């Protein structure tokens, strides 16, 4: 079996056709927005999902490495989405469908945290930092890190405010002009 035919997430094998279906859904959603009058629409890529703390815990092995099969799935989805948006933009008059690459910027933060002013890239700040997410990170959950701004992730999935700040300027610089 080719490595891109199936991705193992936890105990579930997911066919690549699922990722293709999602990108096709985004294509049709874009078309619906266009028909409702929208002319400038931005779509964020999938992030390097295999490098978020929860997926390092669940699929990264004992060393909690990035789960490359999940990153490959995200790259496949991003490739399909980008092509669909290009196709849509060339077929609809005055339509601007902008693919915004979050994948590579966030991956650079994760792989080179010190270059961007971070100390911790593989754990969230909340709880153990390995698996807690969203609702499990609340006022009753002890925050383990002394300085949240040292961390790229708040919980095991979502970036911190500091990480978002590090992403916003390059994202705007690379993409804002594509809307006009």
Regions found by a protein language model. Give the residues of each.
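Oxyanion-hole/transition-state-stabilizing segment in secreted/luminal serine hydrolases
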Residues: 1-20, 32-35, 39-58, 151, ...
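C-terminal helix/juxtamembrane-tail motif
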Residues: 155-180
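A structural motif corresponding to the C-terminal end of an alpha-helix
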Residues: 29-39, 77-97
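Residue-level signature of catalytic and energy-coupling elements of molecular machines
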Residues: 41, 81, 101, 160
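Extracellular glycan-modifying ectodomains
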Residues: 2-4, 82-86, 112, 158-159
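Extracytoplasmic/secreted proteins, especially bacterial periplasmic and envelope-associated proteins
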Residues: 21, 25-28, 72, 76, ...
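Mobile gating loops/cap/lid regions near enzyme active sites that modulate substrate access
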Residues: 48-68, 72-75, 87-90, 94-157
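Residue-level preference for long, well-ordered alpha-helices that form the structural scaffold
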Residues: 3, 15-22, 63-77
């Amino acid at each position: 079996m080719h490595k891109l035919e199936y991705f193992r997430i936890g105990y579930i094998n997911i066919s690549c056709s699922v990722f293709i279906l999602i990108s096709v859904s985004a294509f049709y959603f874009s078309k619906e927005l266009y028909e409702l009058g929208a002319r400038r629409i931005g779509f964020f890529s999938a992030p390097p999902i295999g490098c978020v703390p929860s997926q390092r815990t669940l699929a990264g092995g004992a060393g909690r490495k990035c789960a490359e099969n999940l990153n490959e799935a995200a790259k496949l989805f991003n490739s399909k989405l980008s092509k669909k948006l290009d196709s849509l933009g060339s077929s609809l008059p005055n339509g601007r469908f902008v693919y915004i690459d979050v994948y590579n910027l966030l991956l650079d933060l994760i792989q080179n945290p010190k270059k961007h002013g971070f100390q911790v890239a593989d754990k969230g700040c909340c709880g153990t930092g390995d698996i807690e997410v969203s609702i499990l990170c609340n006022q009753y959950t002890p925050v383990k890190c002394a300085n949240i701004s040292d961390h790229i992730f708040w919980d095991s999935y979502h970036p911190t405010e500091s990480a978002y700040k590090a992403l916003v300027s390059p994202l705007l610089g690379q993409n804002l002009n594509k809307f006009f």
